[in-house]
Amino acid sequence: MNVLEISAQTLRNNIRIIKEYVGSAKICFPVKANAYGHGLELIVEHSHDLVDFFAVANVLEAFRVLDVVEKPVMIFGVIEYNYIDRILSKNIRVSIQDYNDIEKLEKFAKYYNKKPFVHVNLNTGMNRMGVDYNDACRTIQRAYESDWLILEGVYSHLACADNRDHPTNIKQKNRFDSIVEFTKGLSQDIICHLSNSYGFLGQKGICYDMVRPGILSYGFLPEFYVDRVIREIKPIARLLSKVVKIITLQEGEGVGYSLIYRGFEGEQLAVIPIGYGDGFPRELGDRGFVNINDVMYPMAGRMSMDGLTVSLGINEYDVKVSDTVELISAIPRNRNSAFSIAKQTNTIEYDIMSTLNDRIIRKII
């Protein structure tokens, strides 16, 4: 009953726009966290011919990608050695997070007689994962000279890309530039990549050999960006449900847990079978909006695990059981878009979409 409708045409159009924007740079499409909540398998199936790599957070996500298509997949996270035989046999790209990873990985490569493709992750200022900047060149050279590793890429991640004027962006870019110069001195074929969506939109000269357009591919734009071409990018999904019951309040009655919403006599409420148990934000209860038959209605009362209610007022537009309810709109300016919901709940679109769980059906249209 609860369905996330995904437009394959919009997804593909978004990726084509990005490809045009970044020129010759390769596309590494992040599909971690169930493709930001959109459904990993469906997204991979309908995008693989447009991208060069897929990127995931862990090995189980990598396996899911490869169950759909044979395509280069890189893991951003740590090397999970309990799966190393399958990582090697499937040519999954792994990230070197520390100098010591090289020797350990070499031992497994020798044992299985299989050279893995590696990307060296560098900490240029985010201070989360990756080889320390001061140890970068030594690590890159060691990986490049290894007889048992194939150094395919070198990358880092911007800490403040969502704020294009933040001085850390320039600091990280300058550090990465010096590493790129060293790396290209070893081989021009090593893929250097730094930018996520906000990175290459907010900073000049930052595409390098490859970009990693995650949130942009799914249709979400930074507020600061007004480029005409990029503005053609649109959200690819909308979340739908159905009205399952219409309730008419009597005088003095309320609705939901603690009865915090008190309506008027004769007020009608629509019950929608989706709640925080589906990953829909609980904070929206009593302040969010849904669209029923092109009319916006406010949520009423606390959201429960499995349901929410909306006020229809006197139901002048004759909402009925089984009418379609749009909970997340694909139109950014709407009051129920992921952008608007994120603003209401003090979070980001990534959070709104990626927390939608498997109780919600994903459907390509």
Curated annotation (Swiss-Prot):
Cellular component terms (Gene Ontology): cytosol
What general EC class does the enzyme of this chain belong to? isomerase
Q: Among its keywords, does the record have Isomerase?
A: yes
Which residues form each disulfide bond in the chain?
Answer: none
List the active site. Answer: 32, 257
Question: Might you give the EC number(s) for this enzyme?
Answer: 5.1.1.1
Q: Which InterPro entries match?
A: Ala_racemase (IPR000821), Ala_racemase/Decarboxylase_C (IPR009006), Ala_racemase_C (IPR011079), Ala_racemase_N (IPR001608), PLP-binding_barrel (IPR029066)
Drop me one GO molecular function for this one: alanine racemase activity
List the keywords (alphabetical). Answer: Isomerase, Pyridoxal phosphate
Pathway involvement of the protein, from the record: Amino-acid biosynthesis; D-alanine biosynthesis; D-alanine from L-alanine: step 1/1
User: Please, one GO biological process term?
Assistant: D-alanine biosynthetic process
Sequence positions bearing N6-(pyridoxal phosphate)lysine: 32
Which superkingdom is the protein from?
A: Bacteria
**According to its UniProt record, which reaction does this protein catalyse?**
L-alanine = D-alanine
Pfam families cross-referenced by the UniProt entry: Ala_racemase_C, Ala_racemase_N
Tell me which residues bind substrate: 128, 305
* Cofactor(s) the protein needs: pyridoxal 5'-phosphate
User: Its family?
Assistant: Belongs to the alanine racemase family.
Q: So what does this one do?
A: Catalyzes the interconversion of L-alanine and D-alanine. May also act on other amino acids.
Quote the NCBIfam families the UniProt record gives.
alr
Q: Which PANTHER family does the record associate with it?
A: ALANINE RACEMASE (PTHR30511), ALANINE RACEMASE, CATABOLIC-RELATED (PTHR30511:SF0)
What is the name of the protein in this document? Alanine racemase
Organism per entry: Francisella tularensis subsp. novicida (strain U112)
